[in-house]
């Protein structure tokens, strides 16, 4: 699932292609038609479904559509690789312990929107990224993996975001590779 540029999605696809991650992407779901993630998936020959959040106003209804789609595809694990929507209990319960998110902070610090801006505002010297299991409480699920990124003198939002994203591209495939033996047991 993705909403934006799709760089984390493509990092997963590349990890699969190189054999770093033994998995298969059954489809990408985007909620922002024409976004970079959709373009990347189409270029890679990966099926894409578009569930435009502007046309489905009710978040629970959107999440219900996601669950139906994933079950029809017999999806075992759902990865939110830049999904910029808060999910409801419908999706969380439908994929309990099998819904994974990557967040641009060292959780539990800087949960929610604009974690990078929050870190800069707080003046921390280290931030990073976290892969975690999604629960009903925003960015509060069990942590699977983290990577630290120093905040350098003169960092602005764009520079820090770029360095965090570089770590996300490494961390997400690694965390999924470590998790894979356990996800079929749930």
Predicted regions and their residues:
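N-terminal Rossmann-like dinucleotide-binding module
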Residues: 1-36
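Donor/substrate-binding cores of folate-linked one-carbon enzymes
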Residues: 15, 81-184
């Amino acid at each position: 699932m993705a909403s934006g540029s799709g760089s984390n999605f493509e990092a997963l696809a590349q990890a699969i292609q190189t054999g770093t991650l033994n998995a298969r992407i059954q489809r990408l779901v985007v909620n922002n038609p024409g976004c970079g993630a959709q373009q990347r998936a189409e270029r890679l020959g990966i099926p894409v479904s578009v569930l435009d959040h502007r046309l489905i106003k009710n978040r629970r209804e959107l999440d219900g559509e996601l669950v139906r789609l994933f079950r029809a595809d017999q999806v075992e694990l759902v990865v939110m690789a830049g999904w910029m929507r808060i999910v409801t209990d419908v999706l969380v319960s439908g994929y309990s312990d099998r819904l994974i998110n990557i967040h641009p902070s060292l959780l539990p610090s800087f949960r929610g929107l604009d974690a990078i801006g929050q870190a800069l505002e707080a003046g921390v010297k280290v931030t990073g990224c976290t892969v975690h299991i999604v629960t009903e409480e925003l960015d509060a699920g069990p942590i699977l993996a983290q990577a630290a990124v120093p905040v350098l003198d003169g960092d602005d939002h764009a520079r820090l975001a770029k360095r965090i994203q570089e770590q996300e591209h490494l961390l997400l495939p690694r965390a999924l590779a470590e998790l894979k033996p356990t996800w079929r047991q749930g």
